Amino acid sequence: MKLVPVALLYLGSLAFLGADTARLDVASEFRKKWNKWAVSRGKRELRVSSSYPTGLAEVKAGPAQTLIRTQDVKGASRNPQTSGPDAARIRVKRYRQSMNNFQGPRSFGCRFGTCTVQKLAHQIYQFTDNDKDGVAPRSKISPQGYGRRRRRSLPEPGLRRTLLFPEPRPGGAPAPRAHQVLANLLKM
């Protein structure tokens, strides 16, 4: 019975310690992934100017070997005017590049099918609704017209209450000018 745990221990240690015999090239795989990431990042950003260091690591290490070559980057600028320090700080968003290539009419708003159905239904309703008028008739705009019931329920003009004086003034004394302006604003 003691032989089984010892054999398992021996096989486990052999598998664990003997793993270095199978040569796994992890470093080259990591290097490939890192290079791929760096190239894709280089495509997105403009080249950083080499005239001044941008980070603390570059100051201490001095000039370092770059992972990205200019011929690797497809969209690299070959124009010497754009490689100045001002151009290094500009980043271009991806969607703007694709939007500039689109020359069709640009319509803003909802483009879903449900929105199209709603817009169509609204247009049909507007074209077929001949009963309603877009403008209120003159009789409704006059002071005796629209909202006349509400106006009847208000107190008389001389007995108006203001925010500062909630009680009506005795004898219908005129309110100061500031109170009259405030009352006119509240009427609207």
Curated annotation (Swiss-Prot):
Residues that make up the propeptide removed upon maturation: 45-92, 153-188
Subcellular location: Secreted
Keywords for the protein's UniProt record, in alphabetical order: Amidation, Cleavage on pair of basic residues, Disulfide bond, Hormone, Secreted, Signal
Cellular component GO terms held in the UniProt record: extracellular space
GO biological process, one term: positive regulation of heart rate
Region (Disordered): 131-176
Pfam families, alphabetized: Calc_CGRP_IAPP (PF00214)
InterPro entries, alphabetized: Adrenomedullin-reg_peptide, Calcitonin/adrenomedullin, Pro-ADM
An MF annotation (GO) of this entry: adrenomedullin receptor binding
Modified residues (Arginine amide): 41
Presence of the UniProt keyword Signal in the record: yes
Modified residues (Tyrosine amide): 146
Secretion signal, residue range per the UniProt entry: 1-21
Keyword Disulfide bond applies: yes
Site (Required for CALCRL receptor interaction): 116, 125
Function: Numerous actions have been reported most related to the physiologic control of fluid and electrolyte homeostasis.
Family named by the database record: Belongs to the adrenomedullin family.
Identification of the protein by name: Pro-adrenomedullin
Species this protein is from: Canis lupus familiaris (Dog)
Lineage of producing organism: Eukaryota, Metazoa, Chordata, Craniata, Vertebrata
Gene coding for it: ADM
